[in-house]
């Protein structure tokens, strides 16, 4: 029952899926997916398509809705409902994936494969799918054999670890509450069950139990209830389970990350603290409560929400389970009580209350009961505890001072103490669990790591803990993306596979850099660490710095919704997260009252003091408070003795974790949360869709489908699957790649299913599983055949033994019977008595012979002894040689071991030296960087000095100007003020430069951090080298094993040592050479060791020099500080000068006549300036001298270090040469050993061949005997059951007729299926051609789209340029012509143009987005069609394989029928032979009977004669002589008769034996015939069923093909419609592009006009400046120039308007008719008339100049104000000048046209004509462009023609294919004819069976005659027993009986000979 419930939650009900009604409904309604707000996507049927939109009818309510085509997604057929692997879906889109997950979730199927990983949805209820029975179900199964499950993922990881010897990791990722922790527990449960060394279910090992019990303990102390999850892990853990070589668990290790210790003191609403607090308060007994001073829930301040319960969980029971788990873990009771005391102490810490005293801010403790409880529980003194909190000792300078704490500080200290205590306890617990799990002494070969880390958290406001958790999840998701998308595709490219790199756009590095980047700009964690070093830094300053540094980052935003609450927002992969930076600095530093820490370390409780043993690592409050105010941000670096922040520690932990994960093979489990209400059976589609998008599920499925996820190395592929292709690879050596190519050809795999790389074979998903199934089937067949051979061999052996026993028993019985007959016979007794006497006379002769034999034997013995002595001496010599060889081998092994040890030492020393070299190199690089920084700073200082000198010179020139111009005008005074402003700007620049210097110092610190990262990378390299060393050690072990095997082989080859003497001598010579080489190598090693010592000395020297350099660097830093001080002095002097300048100004304003005092002041200032210059020059010289000295020292140190490095490299090269020589020698020795082993293997191979031949002969002999016995049995059975056979024959005839009918029907069905197949193939070919067409069209569309995109980019660039120009024009127009109405009008026009441009740009963007959507949709559909094509190809190949199999079956049937016919012929021949034998025996019997009758008659005559003789007794004497003669004659006759009788009896016995054999043979033949008939019937039935099955499968496949064909036709139609739509879109886009180009040209013309205006304004501004510099007398000329400028502006405006109109008119007319020159001339005349009108307008404008003159007068009044603004405008003018230069570069042609226009204004008609001609040239260029476009169109037409030709060629190919199919049909007809012939042969066999019946009848007659003969023989035997025969006859019979044994043996031999002859 339980199993049935589990199956419900594992397997899919196939009956519901394979419902034909749903299939028909889907096909008829054209069902698709439509977006829905409620359920994500909704099913609907496609009714009508109207342009870009489609009308659909919703399936739920029948409403008709208009939807955009791009929003519609295809629906999969119903047979793909609830599919186990979403990679199998034909239509892969968001809607299908969501629907599949939803259907499975509602059916209770929570696990679903998604390509290479597994998706799990939290069911929020218990499911019966985790029992031991389920574990056993999944144990050792392949992935495709079982439904999706976490056990299947774990089993694949475990099997791949065992098979590939590669470390594995299982990463459970997802949001909080998605089920990661539960799946982690199931993984551990499965591994503990499968990999346990205790295989019995009841007896589980202690280690496995402890591993299972580690989770409940960690959950109790580290998990808590949150809003999203009732059992949320508030820490991360990485569980590493170690396995030995055999796959058994040998230990485990747990690493934890980022415990949320703040939860111990406060919790959010409706949340709990850690479970253990509630477990303890609920589950502790009364005695324990009193010992631990426990109180109710509401008495504890740290339990913010009181007693919050978890539904379905009892805290009391959980407490007992936790205590039991700790007992199983081996934690003693004392430590358990210590843990509980610490937990109670943490709760009591929250009850300590502080109050503020009245007069001061000092805190006090009015009630110390809670403190007393805490001190009692933790074993510390109360007074010391209260003193340490209220007045702690803080280090100030070198002294310690007691400082009173405020209430806030005391509260903070208590909370920090509670958090730190809980954290220390948790660390101790993890350490204790690791100690318990790592106690085994067995070495772990590999491990499986299980990662369970806190999921992604998005609360309303998030803190520092959430940032760390989300940062971790970002890194894990990046690892997933990297392994799934980047590494996968990189491996394809590295292996040389044809692959287009797909960018899925899932790079999360920007977000990771935002958090972790150390510099350039620094990330959030780096900024947080930097702020921790500033004493006055706050969370607010940290946020400001973050916004300043990262404000422009794309993943950083300011909060929009929660502006008042949140500080900043980060865009993570899972969404936007708002962060509140409250107490982040404190959380990052994590300070603690070190007075209390030392007090706890000195606790009387051993457990508490053990917890606080690492007091030195704790950051004290004095360290935080005592940070120097001068500490720069760049000084932040973690050295020894300095504290490390939480962020740094976590970054390092995370880096280690990511490194271990990268070194493993990851298996991803993506956990998904269905809803936030924690309700079972409810699924929020939008929530699930967001998680699927974030997790990259669709991309993972797509790369799994498109890529080749399964890959096998060549050697492994050949080794594993060569059984499937036995004759594909020829014998001998072959390259692995070539072998794999041959194997794949033999396997007949489709080329689309695999790719062959450089070292591996890559397969698509599911191909390897299919190969594994075929391999399993092959192995089962081979094993079954092997078992059958073994059983047959054993049966034959037993039968032969039984036969031998039977013959022996018969011989014994006969001999016993003969002895019983002879033992009472007197002659026999006499014979036994006389026989020994006869031997006495022979004994002397025998003794003589024996003596001679003895002499010969003694001689032989002496010779043998001599030989033995010689052999012993030879053996002794051999043994001595053997001992010598053993000693030499031992010596060699010892030498090798010593050499290996020396090599290992050398490698270790080499690694140490390399590390030292790396450190030195790193330090040298640091020194070089410092020197570079110092040089750069020097250059900057020199530049500053130069700038100061320049400033001083400028000030001097300003003073001179002041003295010269102070009398003339007050305007120059204002100018001097402006110069002062400029100086202030320069001061600001200097300040900015100072900031830049500080920033560079921060960059220096970041470089230092980068150097630290480099050191980490070096550590990674070290790890790699260690791994290399381990590999070398493994090689050494292998070599030792090989040596052991060599010794074994040497022992085996001792018998053949005489043949190997020469080789041994050669080996000895080689050994001697090796010894010489080893001695040389030892000398070289000693020399190398001496060099190493010298290098160590040099290293010490280098270290000393480095210290000296460091001291010099410190001196340089001091010099730098002094230079900074001097610079500050210079700045102060500069300020003083500025103040004096201001004073001078005031004096100038007061007194204009005091020039002498001013000159004196000036001379003083000049003297001061010269003094300053001299001091600066002196300082610069000294600085340069110091830098030169530093350079010299630094260069010397670098040279020395380079020499040391070169020496180490030489030593390294020598060592590597020695190592290579040793390895080459080892390789030579191994080659020689291999040659010896090959010789031995060849000998063994020959011996095995001979044994195999013998076995084959024995098998043939036994088979012959078996065939003989079987034939005998057949004859017997044929005799007994011929009638049954006749009935069976009749039945078989009827069945054969039925089979013939069925066969004909099947053949017709086959023809139909073949015709359908031909149609399908034609359709496929047509589809393939259409697909090619669509692909070509797609490529063309892609090209067009790319052109469109390029045009769009150009437009965007032009628009952006125009917008920038417009903005600049706006600024310039606003600044220069703010008072002019023309500028306002131009501004309005610009705004209108910009608005229209933006509108058009938005329209273009919308059109582009639409095109992109259609492109992506078409791409997806193309991918789906490609997948469908692959399926179609696979089905076709499967059908072809089935057809081949069917042909093979037919051929096998023919072979079987031929075999049966042969056997039948043999049986008939044997039956005929037996019949002839039986007839001959019957004749012999008749003759014997006749002889017997004659003998009886003769006996009667003898009796009568005897009676006559008795009657004539009286006449005895008369006729004695006659009687004796008669007697002799009678005796002779009796003897003859006796011999005849004996012969007859022998013949009778033989006939009886033959009869018995015939009966047995008949029975065997009959049984065999029955069996054959039954077998044939069964085979015919099976074949018929198989044929019916195949026909049904073919029908189903035909149905599928028809459906797929209809789908493909629909898809083709849709593609054609989409192509039409695309073409229309492209046409519209082309039109829009043309319009945009026209509009851009218009804008360019407008910009030219604006540039003219800008040029005019610039020139006017320059002229105004010139006029302002000159006297007021030149105002009149300026007015005239202004009038001219205004006239030119008006003329330019008019010319602009005129040019615009002319351009528009010209464009219109050229569009109408481009080739008409006459019209152009008319247009020219019209334009000339227009120019005349423009001249008239000029005259009108001249009238308006008077008004402008009035305005200019007003402007003259404003000139004074403008003079003040001119200086501010200068900087803008410089910027504008730069912009103008850029614009001049870009617009040279525009300037030329401007000049033409200006000349056109001056020289009226001629210039206009030239301008018009230039425009005509432009128009001609446009015409050229259009002709080019037409040429491109003609090219496209040619391409289309080429496509048409290709299509025609494809049509020809299709015709050829059709002809081929016709040939195949003809072949099938030929096969039908052959089958008909076989039927006729079967009828002939039936006729033969009738003949056989006749023979059977004759056999029956023979058996009846044999029975009669048997009766007669039995009567003869009875007569003999009665004694009716005379005495003489009986005596002869007795004499004859002594030889019966030998005769019967002879008969047996004769029979055996006959049997061999028949065989």
Swiss-Prot record:
One Pfam family from the record: Myosin_N
Q: Which SMART domains match?
A: IQ (SM00015), MYSc (SM00242)
Q: In which tissues is it expressed?
A: Expressed in fibroblasts, brain, lung, kidney, spleen, and skeletal, cardiac and smooth muscles.
**Disordered: where is this region?**
1118-1168, 1694-1717, 1879-1917, 1936-1959
The free-text function statement in the UniProt record for this protein reads: Cellular myosin that appears to play a role in cytokinesis, cell shape, and specialized functions such as secretion and capping.
What family name appears in the similarity comment? Belongs to the TRAFAC class myosin-kinesin ATPase superfamily. Myosin family.
Please identify the protein, giving its name as recorded. Answer: Myosin-9
């Amino acid at each position: 029952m339980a199993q049935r419930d589990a199956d419900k939650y594992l397997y899919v009900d196939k009956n519901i899926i394979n419902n034909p009604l749903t299939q028909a409904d889907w096909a008829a309604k054209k069902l698709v997916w439509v977006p829905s707000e409620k359920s994500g996507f909704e099913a609907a049927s496609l009714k009508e398509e109207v342009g870009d939109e489609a009308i659909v009818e919703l399936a739920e309510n029948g409403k008709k809705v208009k939807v955009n085509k791009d929003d519609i997604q295809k629906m999969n057929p119903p047979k793909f409902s609830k599919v186990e692997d979403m990679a199998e879906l034909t239509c892969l889109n968001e809607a299908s994936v969501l629907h599949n997950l939803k259907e499975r979730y509602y059916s209770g199927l929570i696990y679903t494969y998604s390509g290479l990983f597994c998706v799990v949805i939290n069911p929020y209820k218990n499911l019966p799918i985790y029992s031991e029975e389920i574990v056993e179900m999944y144990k050792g199964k392949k992935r495709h054999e079982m439904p999706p499950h976490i056990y299947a993922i774990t089993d694949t990881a475990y099997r791949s670890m065992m098979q590939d010897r590669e470390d594995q990791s299982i990463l459970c990722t997802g949001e909080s509450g998605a089920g990661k922790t539960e799946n982690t527990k199931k993984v551990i449960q499965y591994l503990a069950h499968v990999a346990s060394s205790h295989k019995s279910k009841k007896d589980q090992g202690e280690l496995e139990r402890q591993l299972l019990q580690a989770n409940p303990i960690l959950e109790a102390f580290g998990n808590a209830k949150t809003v999203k999850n009732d059992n949320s892990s508030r820490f991360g853990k990485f569980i590493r389970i170690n396995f030995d070589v055999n796959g058994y668990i040998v230990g485990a290790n747990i690493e934890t990350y980022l415990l949320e210790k703040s939860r111990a003191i406060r919790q959010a609403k409706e949340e709990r603290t850690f479970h253990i607090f509630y477990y303890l308060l609920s589950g502790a007994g009364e005695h324990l409560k009193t010992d631990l001073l426990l109180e109710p829930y509401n008495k504890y301040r740290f339990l913010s929400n009181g007693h919050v319960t978890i539904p379905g969980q009892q805290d009391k029971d959980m407490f007992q389970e936790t205590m039991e788990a700790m007992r199983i873990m081996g934690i003693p009771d004392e430590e358990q009580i210590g843990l509980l005391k610490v937990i109670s102490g943490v709760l009591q810490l929250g009850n300590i209350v502080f109050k503020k005293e009245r007069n001061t801010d000092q805190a006090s403790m009015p009630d110390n009961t809670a403190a007393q409880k805490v001190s009692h529980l933790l074993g510390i003194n109360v007074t010391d505890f209260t003193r340490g909190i209220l007045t702690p000792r803080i280090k100030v300078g070198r002294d310690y001072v007691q400082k009173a704490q405020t209430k806030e500080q005391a509260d903070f200290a208590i909370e920090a103490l509670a958090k730190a205590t809980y954290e220390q306890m948790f660390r101790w617990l993890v350490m204790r669990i690791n100690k318990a799990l790592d106690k085994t002494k067995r070495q772990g070969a590999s491990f499986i790591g299980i990662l369970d880390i806190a999921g992604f958290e998005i609360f309303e406001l998030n803190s520092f803990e959430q940032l760390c958790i989300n940062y971790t999840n970002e890194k894990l998701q990046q690892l997933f993306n990297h392994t799934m998308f980047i590494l996968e595709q990189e491996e394809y490219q590295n292996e040389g596979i044809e692959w287009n790199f797909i960018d899925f756009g899932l790079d999360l590095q920007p977000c990771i850099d935002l958090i972790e980047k150390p510099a350039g700009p620094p990330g959030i964690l780096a900024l947080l660490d930097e702020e921790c070093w500033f004493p006055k830094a706050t969370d607010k300053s940290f946020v400001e710095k973050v916004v300043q540094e990262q404000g422009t980052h794309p993943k950083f935003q300011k909060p929009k919704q929660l502006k008042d609450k949140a500080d900043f927002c980060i865009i993570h992969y899972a969404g936007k997260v708002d962060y509140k930076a409250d107490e982040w600095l404190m959380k990052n530093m994590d300070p603690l009252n070190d007075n209390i820490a030392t007090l706890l370390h000195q606790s009387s409780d051993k457990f508490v003091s053990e917890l606080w043993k690492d007091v030195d690592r704790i950051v004290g409050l004095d360290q935080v408070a005592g940070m120097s105010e001068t500490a720069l941000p760049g000084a932040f670096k973690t050295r020894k003795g300095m504290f490390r922040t939480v962020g740094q520690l976590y970054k390092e932990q995370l880096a280690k974790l990511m490194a271990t994960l990268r070194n493993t093979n990851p298996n991803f489990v993506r956990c998904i949360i269905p809803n936030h209400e924690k309700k079972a059976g409810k699924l929020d589609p939008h929530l699930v869709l967001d998680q699927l998008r974030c997790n990259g599920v669709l991309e993972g499925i797509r790369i799994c489908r498109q890529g080749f996820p399964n890959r096998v190395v060549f050697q492994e592929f050949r080794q594993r699957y060569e059984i499937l292709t036995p004759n594909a690879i020829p014998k001998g050596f072959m390259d692995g790649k070539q072998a794999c190519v041959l194997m794949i050809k033999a396997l007949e795999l489709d080329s689309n299913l695999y790719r062959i790389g450089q070292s591996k074979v890559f397969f698509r998903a599911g191909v390897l599983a299919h190969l594994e199934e075929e391999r399993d089937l092959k192995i089962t067949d081979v094993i079954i055949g092997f078992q059958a051979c073994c059983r047959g061999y054993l049966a034959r052996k037993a039968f032969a033994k039984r036969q031998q026993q039977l013959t022996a028993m018969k011989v014994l019985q006969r001999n016993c019977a003969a002895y019983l007959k002879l033992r009472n016979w007197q002659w026999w007794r006499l014979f036994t008595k006389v026989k020994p006497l006869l031997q006495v006379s022979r004994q002397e002769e025998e003794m003589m012979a024996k003596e001679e034999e003895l002499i010969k034997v003694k001689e032989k013995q002496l010779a043998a002894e001599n030989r033995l002595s010689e052999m012993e001496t030879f053996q002794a010599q051999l043994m001595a040689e053997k001992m010598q060889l053993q000693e030499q081998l031992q010596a060699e092994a010892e030498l090798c071991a010593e050499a290996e040890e020396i090599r290992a030492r050398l490698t270790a020393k080499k690694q140490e030296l390399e590390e030292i070299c790396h450190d030195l190199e790193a330090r040298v690089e640091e020194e070089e960087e410092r020197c570079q920084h110092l040089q750069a700073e020097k250059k900057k200082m020199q530049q500053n000095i130069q700038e100061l000198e320049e400033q001083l010179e400028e000030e001097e020139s300003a003073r001179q100007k002041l003295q010269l111009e102070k009398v003339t005008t007050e305007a120059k005074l204002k100018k001097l003020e402006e110069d002062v402003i400029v100086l202030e700007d320069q001061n600001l620049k200097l300040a900015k430069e100072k900031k830049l210097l500080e920033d560079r110092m921060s960059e220096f610190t970041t470089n230092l951090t980068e150097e630290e990262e480099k050191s980490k990378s070096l550590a990674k390299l070290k790890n790699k080298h260690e791994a290399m060393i381990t590999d070398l050690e493994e090689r050494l072990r292998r070599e030792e094993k090989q040596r052991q095997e060599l010794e074994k082989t040497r022992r085996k080859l001792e018998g053949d040592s005489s043949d190997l003497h020469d080789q041994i001598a050669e080996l000895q010579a080689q050994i001697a050479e090796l010894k010489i080489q080893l001695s040389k190598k030892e000398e070289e090693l000693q020399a190398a060791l001496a060099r190493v010592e010298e290098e160590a000395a040099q290293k010490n020297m280098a270290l000393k020099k480095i210290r000296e350099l460091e001291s010099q660097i410190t001196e340089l830093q001091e010099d730098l500080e002094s230079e900074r001080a001097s610079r500050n002095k210079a700045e102060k002097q500069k300020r003083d000068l500025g103040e004096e300048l201001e004073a001078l100004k005031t004096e100038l304003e007061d007194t204009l006549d005091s020039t002498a005092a001013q000159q004196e002041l000036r001379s003083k200032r000049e003297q001061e300036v010269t003094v300053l210059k001299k001091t600066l020059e002196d300082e610069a010289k000294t600085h340069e001298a110091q830098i030169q000295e530093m350079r010299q020292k630094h260069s010397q140190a670098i040279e020395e270090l380079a020499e040391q490095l070169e020496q180490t490299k030489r030593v390294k090269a020598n060592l590597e040469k020695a190592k290579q020589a040793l390895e080459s020698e080892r390789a030579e020795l191994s080659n020689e050993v291999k040659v010896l082993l090959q010789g031995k293997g060849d000998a063994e191979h020959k011996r095995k061949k001979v044994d195999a031949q013998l076995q084959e002969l024995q098998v043939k002999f036994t088979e012959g005997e078996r065939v003989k016995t079987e034939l005998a049995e057949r004859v017997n059975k044929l005799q007994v059951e011929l009638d049954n056979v006749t009935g069976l024959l009749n039945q078989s005839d009827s069945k054969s007729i039925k089979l013939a009918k069925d066969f004909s029907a099947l053949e017709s069905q086959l023809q139909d299926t073949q015709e359908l197949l031909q149609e399908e193939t034609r359709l496929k070919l047509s589809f393939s051609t259409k697909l090619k067409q669509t692909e070509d069209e797609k490529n063309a569309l892609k090209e067009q789209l790319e052109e469109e995109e390029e045009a769009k980019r150009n437009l965007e660039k032009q628009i952006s340029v125009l917008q920038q120009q417009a903005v600049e024009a706006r600024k310039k127009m606003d600044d220069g012509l703010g008072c002019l109405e023309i500028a306002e009008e131009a501004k309005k026009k610009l705004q209108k143009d910009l608005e229209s441009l933006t509108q058009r740009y938005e329209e273009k963007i919308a059109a582009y987005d639409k095109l992109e959507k259609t492109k992506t949709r078409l791409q997806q559909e193309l991918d789906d069609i490609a997948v469908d094509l692959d399926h179609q190809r696979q089905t076709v190949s499967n059908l072809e394989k089935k057809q081949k199999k069917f042909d093979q079956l037919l051929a096998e049937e023919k072979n079987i029928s031929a075999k049966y016919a042969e056997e039948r012929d043999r049986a008939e021949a044997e039956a005929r032979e037996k019949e002839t034998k039986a007839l001959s025996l019957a004749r012999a019997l008749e003759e014997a009977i006749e002889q017997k009758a004659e003998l009886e008659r003769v006996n009667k005559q003898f009796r009568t004669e005897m009676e006559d003789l008795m009657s004539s007794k009286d006449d005895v004497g008369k006729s004695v002589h006659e009687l004796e003669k008669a007697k002799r004659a009678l005796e002779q006759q009796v003897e003859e008769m006796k011999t005849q009788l004996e012969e007859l009896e022998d013949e009778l016995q033989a006939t009886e034996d033959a009869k018995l054999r015939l009966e047995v043979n008949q029975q065997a033949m009959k049984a065999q015939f029955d069996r054959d008939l039954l077998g044939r019937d069964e085979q015919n039935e099976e074949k018929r069923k198989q044929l019916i099955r195949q026909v049904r499968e073919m029908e189903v496949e035909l149905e599928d093909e028809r459906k797929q064909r209809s789908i493909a036709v629909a898809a083709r139609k849709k593609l054609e419609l989409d192509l039409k739509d695309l073409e229309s879109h492209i046409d519209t886009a082309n039109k829009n592009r043309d319009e945009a180009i026209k509009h851009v040209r218009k804008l360019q013309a407008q910009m030219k006009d604006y540039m003219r205006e800008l040029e005019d304004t610039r020139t006017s501004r320059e002229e105004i400046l010139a006029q302002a510099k000159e006297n007021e007398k030149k105002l009149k000329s300026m007015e005239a120039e202004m009038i001219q400028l205004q006239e030119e502006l008006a003329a330019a405006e008019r010319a602009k308007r005129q040019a615009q109109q002319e351009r528009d008119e010209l464009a219109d007319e050229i569009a109408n008719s481009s080739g008409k020159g006459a019209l152009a001339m008319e247009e020219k005349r019209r334009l000339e008339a227009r120019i005349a009108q423009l001249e008239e307008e000029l005259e009108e404008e001249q009238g308006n100049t008077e008004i402008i003159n009035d305005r200019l007068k007003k402007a003259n009044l404003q000139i004074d104000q403008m003079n003040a603004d001119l200086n501010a405008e200068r900087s803008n003018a410089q910027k504008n000048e730069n912009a103008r230069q850029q614009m001049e570069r870009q617009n040279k042609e525009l300037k030329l046209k401007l000049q033409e226009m200006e000349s056109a204004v001056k020289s009226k008609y001629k210039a206009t004509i030239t301008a018009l001609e230039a425009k005509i040239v432009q128009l001609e260029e446009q015409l050229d462009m259009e002709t080019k476009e037409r040429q491109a169109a003609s090219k496209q037409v040619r391409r289309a023609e080429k496509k048409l030709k290709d299509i025609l060629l494809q049509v020809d190919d299709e015709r050829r294919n059709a002809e081929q199919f016709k040939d195949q049909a003809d072949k099938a007809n030929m096969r039908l004819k052959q089958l008909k012939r076989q039927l006729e042969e079967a009828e002939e066999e039936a006729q033969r069976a009738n003949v056989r019946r006749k023979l059977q009848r004759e056999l029956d007659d023979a058996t009846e005659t044999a029975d009669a003969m048997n009766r007669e023989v039995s009567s003869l035997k009875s007569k003999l027993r009665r004694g009716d025969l005379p005495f003489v006859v009986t005596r002869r019979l007795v004499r004859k009986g002594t030889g019966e044994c030998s005769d019967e043996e002879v008969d047996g031999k004769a029979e055996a000979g006959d049997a061999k002859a028949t065989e």
